[in-house]
């Protein structure tokens, strides 16, 4: 679930700040999933989530930490998307690369660590 759209997947580089309105939208989506599935005894796995790289690592950390912690609190699991595509020229169109398969390293390491730490809560 790439939400909110303008922060998470819209390639517009100017939409690079994670706002309270974005938090509210995520909260609404998560609560809808909880009401429709969790409260009825079904498991929820969000099989794709991520925020395209707009050269805004700190904002992606804030988004990812909120996203993962909140889904964990609601008893949901999520899977981060990595498409091996990197932002190298200020083009944020589908730049979800996290793991350099050729080097065996993560980038940005701080974002990946934030997602992992948020899952531990």
Name these PLM-found stretches.
Residues 1-73:
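Extracellular glycoside hydrolase catalytic/binding regions
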Residues 56-121:
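Aromatic-rich peripheral "rim/lid" segments of glycoside hydrolase catalytic domains that contact
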């Amino acid at each position: 679930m790439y939400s909110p759209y303008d922060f998470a997947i819209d390639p517009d580089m100017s939409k690079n700040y994670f706002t309270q309105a974005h938090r509210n939208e995520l909260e609404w989506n998560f609560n809808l999933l909880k009401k429709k599935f969790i409260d009825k005894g079904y498991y929820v796995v969000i099989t794709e989530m991520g925020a395209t790289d707009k050269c805004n690592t700190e904002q992606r950390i804030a988004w990812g930490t909120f996203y993962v912690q909140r889904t964990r609190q609601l008893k949901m699991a999520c899977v981060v998307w990595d498409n091996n595509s990197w932002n190298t020229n200020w083009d944020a169109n589908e730049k979800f690369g996290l793991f350099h398969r050729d080097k065996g390293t993560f980038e940005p390491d701080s974002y990946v660590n934030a997602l992992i730490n948020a899952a531990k809560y």
